[in-house]
Amino acid sequence: MEAMGDREEKQGVSEQTETKTEGKQTWKAPDEGNFGRVAQNTAKSLKQESGINQVEMARADAIVAHPLWRKSVVCITQLEASREFCRHDVTHFLDVARLAWIENLERGLGVSKEEIYAAALLHDIGRHLQYEKGIPHDEASVQLGGQILSDCGFSADAKKRILEAIGGHRNKDTKTRDDLCGLIYRADKGSRMCLLCQAEKACNWSEEKKNRHIR
């Protein structure tokens, strides 16, 4: 998301191992090489084991288990530890996913739940690259998200839709669209409680963008 106050600021599924170094916890990313195959086999097994559609969100779960996603979340958390304005954490990702899913249901738009959650989980995942290298976070999130989506077994068409939503979540031209792009844009902005934010006066978001209502 285009964060409050800094709009212009410029590894398979098996294990996430934890080691301790001099009293501090550090993450050792597992090998990414077989991740895509493992994720796809997991989804296949779920589908075979149940008559209900447990497989619906298997790839979204695989995103959260992906070592690159987890590593990025840790980096963002560390870099935003002293941040005054809105942060880009898992709570925000899930807020966006749930708001987008609610609107999708209320309006009967028919957008895939898995694609909504995938886009929400990935839309800010490149935030640390903006802080570290000056890459706009929407562009960085498309770069990282593309790799993660491929590893998690998303089809080419689904990947295209999800990456479009990630890349357009700061573009106001997507605001009124009735597709995945529009859902993610509106949920992203609506997830921020500007009306209760103590840093609101120092935030450089426009009045049009600030969320001052319970929705």
Language-model regions: role of each:
Residues 1-215:
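Metal-dependent phosphohydrolase cores
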